[in-house]
Design a protein with these regions (language model features):
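Positively charged n-region of N-terminal signal peptides that target proteins for export
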Residues: 1-9
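Domain-scale selection of a single, long terminal region
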Residues: 8, 20-21
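C-terminal motif of bacterial Sec signal peptides marking the signal peptidase cleavage site
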Residues: 15-19
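Active-site-proximal alpha-helix that buttresses catalytic centers in soluble enzyme cores
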Residues: 21-252
Length: 252
């Protein structure tokens, strides 16, 4: 009987130990943590943001690059005398009418042709005190100015000389040379480093000593070959002007 009880107790003990071992194994088995799948996104940590480069100025529409490099300056009787509208141009060889009806002179008409052919800017040399409305009286006044060495005051002035590198300079021949208003003009400005291109209208004397006088007045400028036009043919001088400009390489 005792032997039977001992056997039952031993069997119960074995079962109890087996159950405890299973529980321990269950409790000590760690559950792995849940890991979410990685998201495939670009690594931007090393990429700089696209921001405007402050070191570079913003591009703005440039102002006109068509800087007018040519100035067509001229002195003419018709724009320096108190001539009445409708004055008879046939009564004076030095008076001409433009297409718009404004009064100019022989030199002014040639200046218009040069400006149109080159794209240059017209500039009328005007005196503060006008000359007489009679051409003969004007010639006498011009002779008195020359004899006395008088430089007439000018009322027109170039405001932006730096914009021009080529200066056409036109005038009539008065008393075998330039009108004194041209000397006033040359005295007012320093054309050093610029190119002066003279043109003259005359009754047959051409430039006389005008070229050397321009060179003396503006020693720092380059003076090119000039064009002499007879006063009576000024209105029809387009071909002569075109050929001259082409020879100089200044045609537009």
């Amino acid at each position: 009987m005792k032997k039977y009880l001992s056997l039952l107790l031993a069997l119960a003990l074995v079962c109890s130990l087996a159950a405890c071992g299973n529980n321990a194994a269950t409790n000590n088995d760690p559950t792995p943590p849940t890991v979410s799948d990685p998201v495939d996104t670009p690594d931007t940590s090393d990429e700089p943001e696209e921001t405007p480069d402050a070191s570079q100025p913003e591009e703005t529409p440039s102002e006109s690059d068509d800087a007018i490099g040519i100035l067509v300056a001229y002195f003419t009787y018709g724009e320096n005398a108190p001539l009445a509208d409708g004055v008879d141009a046939s009564g004076s060889a030095s008076i001409q009418y433009r297409a718009d009806g404004s009064i100019t002179g022989n030199t002014g008409i040639v200046a218009d042709m040069i400006a149109e052919a080159t794209g240059g800017q017209l500039f009328s040399i005007l005196t503060a005190e006008q000359y007489p409305d009679s051409y003969n009286a004007t010639i006498d006044a011009g002779q008195a100015e020359k004899n006395n060495g008088t430089l007439p005051e000018l009322s027109s002035h170039i405001e932006n000389l730096e914009d021009y590198d080529t200066i056409f300079l036109g005038f009539p021949n008065w008393w075998y040379g330039m009108p004194m208003a041209i000397y006033s003009f040359l005295d007012e400005y320093d054309f050093s480093g610029k190119t002066i291109v003279p043109f003259v209208t005359s009754g047959g004397s051409g430039f006389s000593n005008a070229i050397s006088e321009i060179e003396n007045a503006e020693p720092g400028a380059t003076v090119l070959e000039g064009l002499s036009i007879g006063g009576g043919s000024a209105a029809s001088a387009q071909d002569d002007v075109a050929d001259w400009l082409a020879d100089l390489g200044l045609a537009g």
